[in-house]
């Protein structure tokens, strides 16, 4: 018989220890991975609810199982809040991840072998935008576009490629690009050749919801996102559109279920509903504005300390520190900062001579530190500590001293007070 007082700690101490250790790591380390964030206790409460027990194949009021009257309420709340948040007329909250949301778009709009124009992974794109190791690169004819010498997207080259290759779909969005994307220009190019415009806004969804980054929903035929990252919700995916095209909406729904998934994760959808409600609050706008302020402060400090930032700065939540020409790889920088309790990820940079497993750069983002309460002053201090470590990556004393500074600031700015 199941009892409410059953706990992991009493039943599985080995697993509980790993959970406890990870909780401590999150509190004692500064998180700068651009795709990570801290979700609210309310979201975690939803994810730990009895909604996890319910199968609900189909969509609200069109289920294949009985007993769905309450999960219909949950999913409808998530759908309506997502539409309100991004100005959409359609939302599908069932994708289990951003990648699965993206695969549903491919399935809905394309046939295998169709030509797709997507951002080069080496220039800041994403695996699902056409990488040869991903389903997108294996099933479709991918034409990559990239950035120019200034580190900005080259729209003239994008248009030239579009006219030459006439892709059936163009993809906007990125995983490591620090500029503002001109969604309207991309739609003009797509319309010129009669292509679908699909935008993956996963990295900047929170900024977009808060109005501090341009919204692609009015311009694209279809938009996808994750619900974590800057949006600070549970791990999951989302599909949106404002195309007022019921045929398109039906194709997208069918591509998610039954095309790519079975039963939705109702406990996660409840978490999404909570996160969307939180993102509609005024304080969320204040938070996202601070995310960008902190990123700009960090980028400026890196440059002052002699480090190169791809694109020369940032207009969003992330930046790429370019280590080409230095006697330090991205992998080594990642490891050295880890010893100082600062978590980043190694990342390839444009024209990187090193392999993706080594790289010549690190990607840094500010959503998580801003969630802790960091403002510009703390962000500048942190950047100087990072530069101290990078300048002295083989000096154990510098790493130890930096670690103590990190532990002190983490105590002053806890994740969960």
UniProtKB/Swiss-Prot annotation:
EC number(s) per entry: 2.1.2.1
SUPFAM superfamilies given in the database record: PLP-dependent transferases
Cofactor: pyridoxal 5'-phosphate
GO BP annotations, alphabetical order: glycine biosynthetic process from serine; tetrahydrofolate interconversion
Keywords: Amino-acid biosynthesis, Cytoplasm, One-carbon metabolism, Pyridoxal phosphate, Transferase
Pathway annotation from the record: One-carbon metabolism; tetrahydrofolate interconversion; Amino-acid biosynthesis; glycine biosynthesis; glycine from L-serine: step 1/1
MF GO annotations: glycine hydroxymethyltransferase activity; pyridoxal phosphate binding
Keyword Transport: no
Subunit (UniProt): Homodimer.
Function: Catalyzes the reversible interconversion of serine and glycine with tetrahydrofolate (THF) serving as the one-carbon carrier. This reaction serves as the major source of one-carbon groups required for the biosynthesis of purines, thymidylate, methionine, and other important biomolecules. Also exhibits THF-independent aldolase activity toward beta-hydroxyamino acids, producing glycine and aldehydes, via a retro-aldol mechanism.
Protein name per UniProt: Serine hydroxymethyltransferase
Organism whose genome encodes this protein: Aeromonas salmonicida (strain A449)
Lineage: Bacteria, Pseudomonadati, Pseudomonadota, Gammaproteobacteria, Aeromonadales
Gene designation: glyA
């Amino acid at each position: 018989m199941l009892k409410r007082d059953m706990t992991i700690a009493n039943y599985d101490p080995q697993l509980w220890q790993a959970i406890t250790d990870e909780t401590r790591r999150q509190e004692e380390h500064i998180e700068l991975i651009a795709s990570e964030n801290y979700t609210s206790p309310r979201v975690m409460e939803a994810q730990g609810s009895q909604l996890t027990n319910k199968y609900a194949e189909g969509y609200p009021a069109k289920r294949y199982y009985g007993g769905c009257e309450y999960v219909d309420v949950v999913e409808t709340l998530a759908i309506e809040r997502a539409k309100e948040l991004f100005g959409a007329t359609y939302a599908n909250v069932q994708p289990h991840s951003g990648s699965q949301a993206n695969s549903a778009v491919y399935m809905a709009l394309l046939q295998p072998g169709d030509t797709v124009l997507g951002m080069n992974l080496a220039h800041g794109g994403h695996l699902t935008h056409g990488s040869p190791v991903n389903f997108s690169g294996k099933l479709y004819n991918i034409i990559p576009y990239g950035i120019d010498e200034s580190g900005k997207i080259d729209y003239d080259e994008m248009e030239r490629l579009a006219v030459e290759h006439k892709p059936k779909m163009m993809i906007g969005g990125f995983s490591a690009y620090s500029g503002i994307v001109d969604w309207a220009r991309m739609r003009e190019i797509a319309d010129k050749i009669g292509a679908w415009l699909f935008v993956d806004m996963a990295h900047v969804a929170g900024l977009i919801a808060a109005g501090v980054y341009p919204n692609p929903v009015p311009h694209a035929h279809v938009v996808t996102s994750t619900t974590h990252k800057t949006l600070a919700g549970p791990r999951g995916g989302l599909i949106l559109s404002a195309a007022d095209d019921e045929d398109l909406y039906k194709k997208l729904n069918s591509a998610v279920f039954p095309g790519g998934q079975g039963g939705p994760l109702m406990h996660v959808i409840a978490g999404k509903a909570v996160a969307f409600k939180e993102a509609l609050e005024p304080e969320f706008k204040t938070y996202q504005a601070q995310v960008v302020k902190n990123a700009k402060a960090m980028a400026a400090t890196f440059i002052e300390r002699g480090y190169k930032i791809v694109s020369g700065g940032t207009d969003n939540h992330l930046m790429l520190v370019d280590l080409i020409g230095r006697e330090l790889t991205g992998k080594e920088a990642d490891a050295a900062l880890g010893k100082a309790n600062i978590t980043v990820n190694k990342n390839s940079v444009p024209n990187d001579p090193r392999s993706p497993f080594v790289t010549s750069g690190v990607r840094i983002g500010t959503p998580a530190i801003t969630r802790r309460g960091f403002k510009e002053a703390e962000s500048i201090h942190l950047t100087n500590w990072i530069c101290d470590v990078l300048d002295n990556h083989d000096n154990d004393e510098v790493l130890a001293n930096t670690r103590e500074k990190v532990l002190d600031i983490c105590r002053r700015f806890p994740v969960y007070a």
